[in-house]
Regions:
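A generic structural signal for short beta-strands and their flanking turns/coil linkers
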Residues: 4, 21, 32, 46-50, ...
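Short acidic-glycine-tyrosine-enriched beta hairpin
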Residues: 12-29, 72-75, 109, 115-116
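Acidic/His-leaning functional-site neighborhoods
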Residues: 68-70, 76-120
Length: 120
């Protein structure tokens, strides 16, 4: 989950809880099973977010939760890997053949993104 504006509150039966705000990225692996809730804690401010569900490459692993703050709001004409399966520096770990990279660019700015794995 990547919150763009507003806030999203998270609670789960693993004992995790907190508010995810703009700049925060949350990773949750259901693994062997987890009960959780996510909701907008504000009665007046809307929340805008990306929530990606990615199929894991490993089954029956322990459930887990992780969250980190990234300064992507202050990025300009740059990109940052937020989530990866190969322990890239400063990214959150997922158990899937995927990565999530976010870029922030000015209008008409060009960029190149090279895939790290030839099978994609």
């Amino acid at each position: 989950t990547i919150v763009l504006s507003g806030a999203l509150e998270h609670k789960d039966d693993m004992g995790n809880g907190g508010v995810i705000r703009p700049g925060d990225v949350q990773v949750m692996s259901a693994g062997e099973g987890v009960h959780h809730s996510e909701f907008n804690p504000s009665p007046i401010e809307p929340v805008s977010l990306f929530q990606l569900w990615i199929y894991p490459h490993t089954q029956n692993i322990a459930s887990r939760y992780d969250q980190a703050s990234f300064d992507w709001q202050n990025m300009k004409n740059d990109q940052k890997t937020l989530v990866s399966s190969d322990n890239r520096p400063d990214s959150l770990l997922i158990h899937a053949n995927a990565s999530v990279t976010m870029g922030v660019y000015e209008a008409n700015q060009e960029t190149t993104y090279v895939l790290n794995n030839a099978k994609y």
